[in-house]
Amino acid sequence: MTDTAMPGHGLLDGKVVVVTAAAGTGIGGAAARRCLEEGARVAISDQHHKRLAATRDELAAGHGDRVWSLGCDVTDEAQVAALVEGAAGHFGRIDVMINNAGLGGTASLLDMTDEQWDRVLDVTLTGTFRCTRAALRQMVAQGHGGAVVNNASVLGWRAQPGQAHYAAAKAGVMALTRCAALDVAAHRIRVNAVAPSLAVHPYLAKVTSEDLLAELASREPFGRAAEPWEVANVIVFLASDYAAYMTGEVVSVSSQHP
């Protein structure tokens, strides 16, 4: 299955969406594409500036000035603030924040270093916290509601060898999502998350052997990994008004749960 353009239904017409870790062909890039196809104006960000520029140019070729980009490392609070302020300044407001930035890796807890633990938690959990907080402050100041969609993982529910840091970070994203939802419900802001299982991603292919990827895919009832756009479709739903009564939810995008 390939990430091809899908017919838009105007689910996000007129909305301004910010997507982190949106460079390339992973879930973030697919989410940006789907939001554009659904009528949104989209600010994309990534810490990899060359890949970000290439993605921006590709998206702008089909969607013109509805695409804007700014490099951002989510471990840097000043860069996160600049992203939110820049997107709001460029498009006039922010309606949706999609927090996709995360970092994985494999290490037994017996061998895991403090640096490995800290790096994964800083990007995956604390980075999501920084971006969520900045977006919520902007949305509260605007006064017309909004939505945040975080990218968690089924590993926030399940145990897997060598994944203590990543699983802890994703479980934290789930808890952050639920608590943030209660903090801002009075402002008509919704906070939800998706929890994919195995999904196709260039980074995953770099850090995981082909044999292990094949084994993991074979465990899925569908016998394959999810395509990025299949996860992005659920993100778009949660960002849209179709999910207007959903908040604090973690939606499994998986063929098995939890």
Kindly give the residue locations of the regions a language model identified.
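Substrate-binding pocket helix/loop in short-chain dehydrogenase/reductase
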Residues: 108-109, 116-121, 204, 212, ...
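C-terminal substrate-recognition "lid" of short-chain dehydrogenase/reductases
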Residues: 91, 189-190, 224-254
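Residue(s) in the substrate-gating loop at a strand-loop-helix junction
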Residues: 153
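Short C-terminal tail/terminal secondary-structure segment
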Residues: 2-9, 26, 158, 218-222, ...
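Alpha-helical segment proximal to the catalytic Tyr-Lys
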Residues: 137, 182-186, 244
